[in-house]
Regions:
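N-terminal, positively charged/glycine-rich alpha-helical extensions of SAM-dependent methyltransferases
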Residues: 2-27
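Soluble or luminal CAZymes and related metallo-dependent hydrolases
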Residues: 11, 38-43, 127, 178-182, ...
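Feature marks short, surface-exposed loop/turn motifs that line or immediately flank catalytic pockets
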Residues: 25-26, 153-156, 203-207
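Conserved SAM-binding loop and adjacent beta-strand
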Residues: 28-47
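Conserved SAM-binding loop
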Residues: 44-48, 55-157, 236-238
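Acceptor-substrate binding/catalytic loop of class I
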Residues: 149, 168-185
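Short, flexible, mixed-charge acidic loops at enzyme active sites
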Residues: 156-165, 210-216
Length: 245
C-alpha cells in the first residue's frame, strides 16, 4: 500500500492513471472509494424508470460501474464511458456496456441517450464547456441529465482536498481544486445547450463518515442526503428542451 501511495504522490494531481493504481478499491467494502458508492446510490435515486423500451442510460465517467446495482431494475441499456480500462472491465462484470472514451469527446451518436449521468466527473475535466456540450449532444430532446460534483470555494477545497485526504476520505492527489465548478457556472453552461439545470446541496451522513473512518475495510452503510447548502457538494437534474436536437 505504501509503495502505491508513494507512486500516486509522484504523479500530478487529477491524473487518470491514479484510478488504475486504485482499481482494487472500486468494489472494496469500506475502501478508498466508499463515498463514491454512496454518491452512486443517491445519483441513481434521481433517475426514474425507463419511459420506453430500449431506453439508454449513458454513465459518463462510470469508473467501476458503481451505479449498476442501483439502476439494474429500471429498464435501461446502461452504457458506461470512461478513460480507465481497468474500471471499465469491472463495470462490464456488473452489466454495464463499456465504452473507452473521453467525456469531452464522447464516442456516441447525437441524441442516443434518454438519461445522461455525470457523477463525480465534472470536477476532474479540464474542458468544462466542451464536456457539457458533449453531455448535452448525446442527450435526446426531452432527455434527463443527472450530475453531482464539488463546488469551487475555500470551504470545499479545505473539506475535499486538505481535510479529506488527510483523514483518508479521498485518495491523495485524486482532486485538483482548480477544476472545481460553481453551480452558477454549470447552470449557465448547460443552459447554452437547452438544458435547464436545477441544483440542490448534498452531504454525507455524519454517522456514515464516522463508521467509515473507524471501521476501515468493512461496509459502512453511509448515505448522501439532500441539504439546503451547495457550499461543498451538490446534485443537479435537468431536461433538454424538446425543440433542441
Amino acid at each position: 500500500m505504501r509503495a502505491r501511495l508513494d507512486h500516486m504522490r509522484s504523479i500530478s494531481r487529477n491524473d487518470p492513471r491514479q484510478y488504475d493504481d486504485l482499481a482494487d478499491q472500486w468494489w472494496h467494502p469500506g475502501g478508498g472509494f466508499e463515498m463514491l458508492h454512496w454518491l452512486a446510490e443517491a445519483r441513481a435515486a434521481l433517475i426514474p424508470p425507463a419511459a420506453r423500451p430500449g431506453a439508454v442510460l449513458v454513465d459518463a465517467g462510470c469508473g467501476g460501474g458503481l451505479m449498476a446495482p442501483h439502476v439494474a431494475g429500471k429498464g435501461y441499456r446502461h452504457v458506461g464511458v470512461d478513460l480507465g480500462r481497468t474500471g471499465l472491465r469491472l463495470a462490464a462484470q456488473r452489466g454495464v456496456e463499456p465504452v473507452n472514451g473521453d467525456v469531452a469527446a464522447l464516442p456516441l451518436a447525437s441524441g442516443v441517450a434518454d438519461v445522461v449521468a455525470a457523477g463525480e466527473i465534472l470536477e476532474h475535466v479540464t474542458d468544462l464547456p466542451g464536456t457539457v456540450a458533449e453531455l448535452s449532444r448525446v442527450l435526446r430532446p426531452g432527455g434527463l441529465v443527472v450530475i453531482d460534483t464539488v463546488n469551487d470555494n475555500a470551504l470545499s477545497r479545505f473539506i475535499t482536498v486538505t481535510a479529506g485526504e488527510r483523514l483518508g476520505f479521498a485518495p491523495p492527489g485524486i482532486h485538483d481544486a482548480s477544476l472545481f465548478v460553481r453551480p452558477r457556472r454549470l447552470i449557465a453552461e448547460f443552459a447554452r445547450h437547452g438544458v435547464r439545470l436545477d441544483v440542490r446541496g448534498a452531504r454525507p451522513t455524519l454517522g456514515g463518515l464516522l463508521r467509515w473512518r473507524l471501521l476501515r475495510g468493512r461496509p459502512t452503510r453511509g448515505r448522501i442526503v439532500p441539504t439546503g447548502l451547495t457550499a461543498v457538494l451538490y446534485q443537479g437534474t435537468g431536461r433538454k428542451d424538446r425543440e433542441r436536437s
